[in-house]
Amino acid sequence: MPPMTRKTRIQPIEPVAEEDDNGYDRPSKSQLKREMHELQVLGQALVDLPKDALKRMPMPESLGDAVREARRITDHEGKRRQLQYVGRVMRSLTDDETAALRTALDAQRGVNKAATARLHWIERTREQLLASDDALTEFLRQHPDADIQEGRTLIRNARKEAQQGKPPRYFRELFQWIKAAGGASDSDDEAADDAGDDHDDEA
């Protein structure tokens, strides 16, 4: 009977992380690609910001110049190349600088969302006030400091100008009256401008 031979089980080879000259693990290519894409998206968000909001972003001068140039370019291919350059500039930022930008952008989005919701509320309230006298009673109950006489006058004149097809002067003034009665501040107006929702100019 021939002697039994012991089979050797071949163990799978574990991938070895790349190390740099100092012995630290290098990030994988997929990780680098993902980080580059995230920075590109962040750069695009900066380019898309309203002008006033962009001024409040904590950017180094080199990034600010690159972003403003991207905003200026209208040619599709030229803008695409400039956005790539914005991404390259962003890769030179420190982790703290990138984190500060993300925080500022998140705050800006929150302000815009709140401002847009508030403007929509003002518009809905204006529609209700013009449609029903009962709506004014309810509005005054919720906002007792509002000027009752001014509100009634604006509503009456806004209805009349709509019937006569006149320019919406009182319609717009009613918007401002509702906004003031609701306690809108200057910061609300600024946020509304940033959001691009200049609703009180509509017809």
Swiss-Prot record:
Q: Which Pfam families match?
A: DarP (PF04751)
Q: Which GO terms describe its cellular component?
A: cytosol
The keyword Cytoplasm is annotated on this UniProt entry: yes
Query: Which keywords fit this entry according to its UniProt record?
Result: Cytoplasm, Ribosome biogenesis, RNA-binding, rRNA-binding
The segment annotated Disordered runs over 1-31, 182-203
Tell me where in or outside the cell this protein is found.
Cytoplasm
UniProt main location, coarse: cytoplasm
Q: Which processes are annotated in GO (biological process)?
A: assembly of large subunit precursor of preribosome
Q: Name one GO molecular function term.
A: ribosome binding
List the InterPro entries. Answer: DarP, DarP_sf
Per UniProt, the ranges with Acidic residues bias are 186-203
Annotated transmembrane regions: none
**Which HAMAP family is this protein grouped with?**
DarP (MF_00765)
Q: Which PANTHER family match?
A: UPF0307 PROTEIN YJGA
Functional summary from the UniProt entry? Member of a network of 50S ribosomal subunit biogenesis factors which assembles along the 30S-50S interface, preventing incorrect 23S rRNA structures from forming. Promotes peptidyl transferase center (PTC) maturation.
Query: In its UniProt entry, what is this protein called?
Result: Dual-action ribosomal maturation protein DarP
Q: Which organism is it from?
A: Burkholderia cenocepacia (strain HI2424)
What does UniProt list as this organism's lineage?
A: Bacteria, Pseudomonadati, Pseudomonadota, Betaproteobacteria, Burkholderiales
**Gene that specifies this protein:** darP
